[in-house]
Amino acid sequence: MRNLNTELDFFVSFSALKEENISQLKVYWAQSNLVELYYGESFYINIVCSRPIVDENVTTWPENEGFRIEGTLLESLVESVTSASNYPKVNAFSLMCSGIPSFIWVEDDKQYALWACLAQLDSYSYPNHKLEIHVYKHILPDLPQSSEVDRNSETEGTREENSNTSDWDEQNEYVSEVEGDYNLLGSLSNDIQFRSNPPVISGAYVFGESDVANELKDPSRKTKTRKKVFECSVPVVLKLRSYALNESNQYITSIVSPDSSCENIRILGFKAETNAATISLFAPKTPEKLQITLSSSDVFTIIHLLQIPDNIKHIELQCFCKVIVAQKLSETLVESMPFTYKHPPVLITRRTPTKTHTKQLSSSGNVSAAQSISSLNLLEISASSPSYVPSGSSFSVRANLYNPLDFSIDLLIRIPLYCYDDCLTNKEHSTSKSEEKSSELLKYPNGHTISPGIIALSTKLYTGSIFPKCEKDFDLHFLAYKPGSYDLSSISIEDVNHVVHKPRKLSKELQIIVT
């Protein structure tokens, strides 16, 4: 164990330092850079300061001596910025700690006084930030003598005392014999005595090796300070994908994986909420007790079905992922307390055929029908699909559209709802493969309905704007219903701004065999 009287450091744990576990101080020290401290809105941390006891009576400890503790959040605007003064600073907490010590620690015939303080982190919204904690020895005359938490966050730039990293006086009797004479222990305090529940974090946690500031001497101030900076980030990577089945229904796919800073995460639950739509879980079927463990290379997918009302164009989606982070400590996998990662709201827009404006090439006039036909002919299109598909399964046709023109183009892909077996329909209905019949239920001459073999999950797909010299990929989803041979060449593409032209085929050869 490193000597408490020679080095200042932070300890991060998930239990408060109490009388019954004071003997485990070595464990707190050993885990200082291996266990993360998660925090968020109205979240409490337990801070313990330490200094050696030298020929003093603890019961008559001077009341005018103690510690001032300040936590500051810093946003990193530019990666190359190294000076802390270039960061916008926001006060996270500020408190004083003085009076009789909370605990006494004895090691190698030396005694150390420990002061336990409770600090509350204010809410914040920095996406990329650091947590910087300063501990000042001695209460300055112009500071309030209070141990209450200052919960009113303010811009750190307006407080000169925070931007000045004060130092210690070599003549001070408690400092002259040792290089550093106090420590800061930070612990997650969510037990009953602190009345704090596991936090819903706004996207951050403290972790890893930290920067210990160099000591700076200022003869005008009889204080000593040590500073340490922790990186803050999200331990969970969450990616969202949306696929529109039709104008009212969309699949929302959530892909969850551990952050690069984590070795393992365990997903305990996942919930998605919207403000004006109906969302239901599609897969997996039993989300209540997932208990999915992911390593750094693993991903887990959750799919929701989103139903958007007809009068709503945009909705907000918010996801909550309940997670436990597990790290290796001395060859043992140590789990943290469960916490909930709250993903920032995502705006989802429905696809709608309301784009009826006229695209203009220049101020000279509108795009003519001939130009529109030419633009479709110049459009580079490719499509691919599996040759064999088992019945009862779903499959997709991948379409790639490249716009070589000097202006954007908005397209609509039309897909027949039903496709029929070529052999059967060629015998009985010579026109069954026409565009007029491909999306309708066909019947035998005696009135019996012919069962379709392939059913499309959506009959329309709007591409949105494909910008000049850009390409887009789209997946068209189908259900293989009945064995047979099927032709999907009736899939067509239209320019939504100019409906006078003849649609273009997606591909002339899209043959699917359902086994």
Swiss-Prot record:
Region (Disordered): 146-171
One annotated Gene Ontology cellular component of this protein: TRAPPII protein complex
Keywords: Cytoplasm, Nucleus
UniProt-listed GO biological process terms: intra-Golgi vesicle-mediated transport
Transmembrane segments: none
Keyword DNA-binding assigned: no
Protein name according to UniProt: Uncharacterized protein C14F5.02
InterPro entries in the cross-refs: Trs65
Subcellular compartments: Cytoplasm; Nucleus
Basic and acidic residues: compositionally biased ranges: 148-162
